[in-house]
Amino acid sequence: MINSIKYFEEECISRFEKLEDKFMKEPTKLAEYVYGLTDELHRLGLEMIKESLETMDMMLQKSPVRLEHWVVEAHSPKQLTTSLGDVVFGKTLFTSKETGKSEYLLDRILGIGPNERITEDAEAKMLGEAVQTSYRRGGEETSLMSEVSRQTVKNKIHQLEFPKNEEKPDRKKEVDYLYIDADEDHISLQFREKRGDLTENENHQKNNSLITKLVYVYEGIENESPESKRHCLIKPHYFCGVNTGEENLRFWDEIYEYLESHYELDKVKKIYVNSDGGSWIKSGIKRMAGVTHVLDEFHLEKYLTKLTSHMKDSRDEAAEKLRTVIRSRTKGEFEELVDELEGYLEGDRGIKRMEEAREYILANWTAAKTRLERRDGVIGSSTEGHVSHVLSDRMSSRPMGWSIVGAEKMAQLRAYYLNRGDMLELVRYQEKELPKASGGEYDVLSSTQILRSEKNRHEELGKYVDSISHSISSQNKKIVYFNAHIWDL
């Protein structure tokens, strides 16, 4: 810290004074004053980080504990991109006396992989921006004073692994009704596994469409504020993916596990699933006991319009007749009414459209009935709006192409973000190959294990450190703190 203090005294104070003098002369230049101070404070922060890292490395070099197992091999510079900017510092390569393998011990203590160039805080900022805008913007926002390439952002996102929802409330919640809304977005692929692998059909159209799935669980709807006409979901939780086959079934199992771990399901009167009746949704519904499918209003009205659009001024009356038949009559009576409406067509034009609508409503007959009967607890669905907000805004509203891996990871990242997930915790969740020196053996540790180990060690050493913290200098306290990490080498 001594060098940082000298830097502050010799460089920063004079620059601060110059900035203040300029501001006093031109009081309307407050923005420039703030910008100037911000830049200087950034530089000071980077100097402090650099000095702290080099102090740690020097303590490793001087440590008698380190000397028992490791010898100094070489010194080299390293650049790290932090959320504050790039830090260039010197570090030491050590060689193990037991194994003959070389390693930068400071990297191990910091939890940084051998080829890692971006710190956790910078990566968290990168993900927080990329999930909302683009890979390019994610790279630009990684650091205040530098940036990384869009390819780096893409690689980081493609490598992401997401934690399962294992956090359980202390007490399960009791509610009368639960709602599951499900829908999908269609995105364009650049390729599936590798470039050039998209096939064409007989009409020379590329098979480049991929379904991204959205499911969200909530307890109902309420007004955003007492006087607002806008509604919002109560306690929503989002799930996204591009799962197919067996993966789709596991996707729905994860949703049910969330319900089971957060709610007293035996106290719930009904669980309603609002959807368009897609096959991937119906296969999931079959895996969950006690749920009732409700056809969402958007798709029901869409197909009623297909059945009645040719009726012109009588369109509303015809649509209401169809609703009445669906609500309280039989499939046979519905088909008779559709046949009657087809009789008003001019020639064969429109037959295909009406037959498609007839088949759709018949395939979702019970779900359509439930929607129109408005049974206890049935509420309006918002699937189309949520698909636009959750998936389309980032993945399909602007011209862009994806790979299957990229689409899967971004969909999951969108869900994590909307569930208020902490990006720093997500970065730390990723597995890192960090060797643990113990008799020359190396184990792969996850960041979760590392954090747990650090917590245990703090509990063991904390009482001792606290007992002497009032009687030793600041510099010596740092030595005590850091030596606790060297003892593990």
Labelled PLM ranges:
Residues 1-51, 94-489:
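Catalytic center-proximal scaffold of phosphoryl-transfer enzymes
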Residues 42-69:
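N-terminal accessory alpha/beta regions
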Residues 61-80, 368, 374:
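Short acidic, Pro/Gly- and aromatic-enriched capping/linker segments at domain boundaries
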Residues 70, 75-78, 82-112:
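Cys/His-rich short segments
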